């Protein structure tokens, strides 16, 4: 009976709201199961009510608390005493010096607010362990550890900001990236999430980049590599008189390195390789991710890597003309040793006018006229080959090279040649005597934290964005850098990436449906507020600490904010300020934007501010939906490194309970339909419309939402698409629409599988882009 009394107390309002669970059922179960086994038992009952999952989470927290220290300083002391302690002596000294403050302020009851997915993920990935794998801290300890790392490891211990940051983390208002969470306070605090490398076409650098990528991966970073400068297969090497192997063998080498250099032993390494479409080896590149086919059968593929295409406007124009029979689609292929610098130039304007500023187009056709091309194909042939691979593995990603460069605040620094693991980071990088390897530190804001009874708290969101900006700026100074080139880049540009999660929760709370005018307007306003709050704080930090060294010549130095770059490109109407003012009910007015422009001209601390990354772990921990995406399903099992857990859409359940429709019959129909409610006709049409899953809605809706938020994104976004069937025409429709709307990301993952309504089982959410093997830049 002792176990039952524990369960009964955990189900009461002692640890939050009282739970709607059947205590009689649990009384019978406790005779059969241990407390640990009851966690799985309760999780399996989630289909009855999401409170069973909450009870399972509370049980998991309770057991963790039973086996860990009851104060923060004691937890640190026990870890420091270990023979192989990861904690840095400086961190331990700070904790000992201020232990009375930390111990009295930390609130372990907040651990009980974690979801089951959240506490299990924390235990598996983030909480520090001893050499035997025994967990040595609680989630609240981890949050305090991160806060101290950010504000307590410099020349001055900023206690006010330590406690504020702890509060924001522990109340799940903000989250910091995975490397920050598991490396904060350690002897080698690599806190950065994303690294961008540019591979040069010489043997020394080719191998240097294998080593560099491996070292970065070992510290928890995700990597994006540009391969566009590597000469094509069979190209002549004048120094040796031999022929080049091209990119294929090099990709296989990086694939092997990734498998070996896992992220601190916590999860697999994660690399993405990028190539431009004019490269002679493009068809080889497109076949290498495949799990089936000739290359896979010969084991010449590299399926563990992620792949990305860097797509210029010229290709999209030729493709569109070919699709509509306005041209033959001719596309020329080159080897960069014979046609140099194509990846180092971009088109500043999209106009087809002969006097338009289009450096890439000019150089491309110059090389065509000089007959430097090594092959000829068509745009359709390339996109068809891309599509064959996407059907199998969901990528290569598509990044619109020219849009990314022309809308970059750092376009004066150099051409952006590639992105990162999840195609949301866009930092210039190059090799040479003054090499720069792009680095970005990530965090995300929980949009659901600002839901009020009858309104949305845009002021609170602005303030939180400012707090995260200051956090990330401090991380730049306090983190460990694996190479001098990463340090040089980060200190020069000081880029940060603030993302979001819980947008679908916001819409569900206000009973909005994706694609409605009010939802699109709110999407725009939320990201405008996020950007505004980050820029405002970055300007304030510049007054205190100075601007980033590459500020002179940046768009901001000329009084141009991120949305102004979109207006300049004719991708955003000039009246956007009035629209945002109306949606935010006067919180963000045209006058405030004008004042921000004037202030930014005087100095900005950070070269980039916002980037919309996947947020799997943050969403898992807090029970909110991932990043800016719609709900993938209303019922599914989520597979993570920690195991599989049932996730139920609580907003749908609450709406059905309001009208007395959450019955056993509806539960069974939902289960049979794999999480879809579109064919459950007992549910009102208005509710069915609001709870369409990401695949059930027209994919153009996702593009339109992306176009609404993208003008306020300093870098880019991890934009997924979901389709029932693999039809190229459907995919091209959204890609071309996104390109025409000026999006920076064409696509992250494209998912093709039967929809929820055709599956007679709970969806396994393995199709999510934020899977366990792709979490390096995730939060």
UniProtKB/Swiss-Prot annotation:
Site, as annotated: Allosteric effector binding: 201, 231
Superkingdom of the organism of origin: Viruses
List of residues binding substrate: 178, 193-194, 222, 420-424, 614-618
InterPro entries, per the entry: NrdE_NrdA_C, RNR_lg_C, RNR_lsu_N, RNR_R1-su_N, Rrm1
Enzyme active site: 420 (proton acceptor), 422 (cysteine radical intermediate), 424 (proton acceptor)
UniProt xrefs under Pfam families: Ribonuc_red_lgC, Ribonuc_red_lgN
Catalytic activity: a 2'-deoxyribonucleoside 5'-diphosphate + [thioredoxin]-disulfide + H2O = a ribonucleoside 5'-diphosphate + [thioredoxin]-dithiol
Gene3D superfamilies: 3.20.70.20
Sites annotated Interacts with thioredoxin/glutaredoxin: 774, 777
Keyword terms, alphabetized: Allosteric enzyme, ATP-binding, Deoxyribonucleotide synthesis, Disulfide bond, Early protein, Nucleotide-binding, Oxidoreductase
GO molecular function, one term: ribonucleoside-diphosphate reductase activity, thioredoxin disulfide as acceptor
Triggers of expression: Expressed in the early phase of the viral replicative cycle.
Subunit structure: Heterotetramer composed of a homodimer of the large subunit (R1) and a homodimer of the small subunit (R2). Larger multisubunit protein complex are also active, composed of (R1)n(R2)n.
Record's function text: Ribonucleoside-diphosphate reductase holoenzyme provides the precursors necessary for viral DNA synthesis. Allows virus growth in non-dividing cells. Catalyzes the biosynthesis of deoxyribonucleotides from the corresponding ribonucleotides.
Family label: Belongs to the ribonucleoside diphosphate reductase large chain family.
Name by which UniProt lists this protein: Ribonucleoside-diphosphate reductase large subunit
């Amino acid at each position: 009976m002792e176990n039952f009394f524990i369960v009964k107390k955990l189900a009461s309002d002692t640890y939050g709201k009282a739970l709607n669970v059947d205590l009689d059922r649990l009384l019978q179960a406790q005779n059969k199961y241990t407390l640990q086994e009851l966690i799985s038992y309760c999780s399996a009952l989630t289909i009855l009510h999401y409170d069973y999952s909450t009870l399972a989470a509370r049980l998991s927290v309770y057991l963790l608390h039973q086996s860990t220290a009851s104060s923060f300083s004691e937890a640190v002391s026990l870890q420091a005493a270990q023979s192989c302690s990861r904690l840095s002596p400086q961190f331990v000294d700070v904790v000992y010096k201020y232990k009375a403050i930390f111990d009295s302020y930390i609130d372990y009851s907040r651990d009980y607010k974690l979801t089951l997915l959240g506490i299990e993920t924390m235990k598996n990935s983030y909480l520090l362990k001893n050499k035997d794998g025994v967990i040595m801290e609680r989630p609240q300890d981890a949050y305090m550890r991160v806060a101290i790392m950010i504000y307590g490891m410099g020349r001055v211990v900023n206690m006010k900001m330590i406690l504020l940051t702890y509060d924001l983390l522990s109340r799940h208002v903000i989250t910091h990236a995975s490397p920050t969470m598991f490396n904060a306070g350690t002897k080698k605090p690599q806190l950065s999430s994303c690294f961008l490398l540019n591979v040069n076409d010489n043997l020394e650098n080719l191998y240097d980049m294998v080593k560099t990528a491996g070292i970065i991966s070992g510290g928890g970073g995700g990597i994006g590599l540009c391969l566009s400068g590597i000469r094509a297969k069979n190209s002549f090497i004048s120094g040796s008189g031999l022929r080049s192997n091209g990119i294929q063998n090099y990709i296989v080498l990086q694939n092997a390195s990734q498998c070996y250099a896992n992220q601190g032993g916590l999860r697999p390494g994660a690399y993405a390789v990028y190539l431009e479409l004019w490269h002679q080896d493009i068809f080889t590149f497109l076949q290498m991710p495949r799990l089936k086919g000739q290359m896979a059968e010969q084991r010449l593929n590299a399926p563990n890597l992620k792949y990305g295409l860097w797509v210029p406007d010229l290709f999209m124009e030729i493709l569109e003309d070919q699709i509509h029979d306005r041209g033959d689609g001719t596309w020329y292929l080159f080897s960069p040793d014979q046609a140099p610098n194509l990846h180092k130039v971009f088109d500043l304007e999209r106009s087809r006018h002969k006097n338009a500023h289009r450096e890439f187009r000019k150089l491309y056709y110059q090389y065509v006229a000089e007959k430097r091309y090594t092959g000829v194909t068509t745009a359709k042939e390339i996109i068809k080959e891309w599509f064959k691979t996407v059907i199998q593995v969901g990528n290569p990603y598509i990044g619109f090279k020219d849009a990314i460069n022309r809308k970059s605040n750092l376009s004066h620094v150099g051409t952006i040649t590639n992105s990162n693991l999840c195609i949301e980071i866009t930092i210039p990088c190059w090799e040479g005597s003054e090499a720069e390897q792009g680095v970005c530190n990530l965090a995300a804001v929980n949009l659901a934290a600002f839901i009020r009874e009858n309104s949305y708290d845009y002021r609170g969101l602005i303030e939180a964005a400012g707090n995260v900006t200051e956090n990330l700026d401090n991380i730049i100074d306090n983190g460990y850098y694996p190479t001098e080139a990463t340090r040089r880049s980060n200190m020069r540009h000081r880029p940060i990436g603030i993302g979001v999660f819980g947008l679908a929760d916001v819409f569900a709370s206000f009973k909005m449906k994706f694609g409605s005018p009010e939802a699109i307007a709110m999407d725009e306003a939320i990201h405008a507020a996020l950007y505004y709050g980050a820029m405002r704080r970055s300007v304030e930090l510049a007054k205190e600490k100075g601007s980033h060294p590459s500020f002179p010549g940046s768009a901001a130095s000329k009084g141009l904010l991120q949305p102004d770059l979109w207006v300049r490109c004719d991708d955003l109407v000039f009246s956007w300020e009035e629209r945002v003012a109306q949606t935010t009910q006067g919180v963000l007015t045209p006058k405030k934007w004008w004042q921000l422009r004037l202030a930014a001209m005087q100095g900005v601390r950070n070269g980039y501010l916002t980037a919309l990354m996947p947020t799997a772990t943050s969403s898992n921990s807090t029970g909110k939906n991932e990043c800016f995406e719609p709900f993938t399903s209303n019922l599914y099992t989520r597979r993570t490194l920690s195991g599989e857990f049932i996730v139920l859409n609580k907003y749908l359940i609450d709406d059905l309970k309001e009208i007395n429709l959450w019955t056993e019959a509806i539960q069974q129909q939902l289960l049979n339909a794999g999480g879809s409610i579109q064919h459950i006709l007992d549910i009102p049409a208005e509710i069915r419309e609001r709870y369409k899953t990401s695949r059930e809605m027209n994919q153009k809706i996702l593009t339109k939402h992306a176009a609404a938020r993208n003008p306020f994104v300093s870098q880019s976004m991890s934009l997924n698409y979901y389709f029932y069937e693999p039809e190229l025409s459907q995919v091209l429709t959204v890609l071309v629409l996104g390109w025409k709307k000026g999006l920076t990301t064409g696509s992250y993952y494209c998912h093709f599988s039967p929809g929820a309504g055709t599956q007679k089982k709970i969806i396994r959410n393995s199709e999510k882009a934020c899977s366990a093997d792709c979490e390096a830049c995730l939060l």
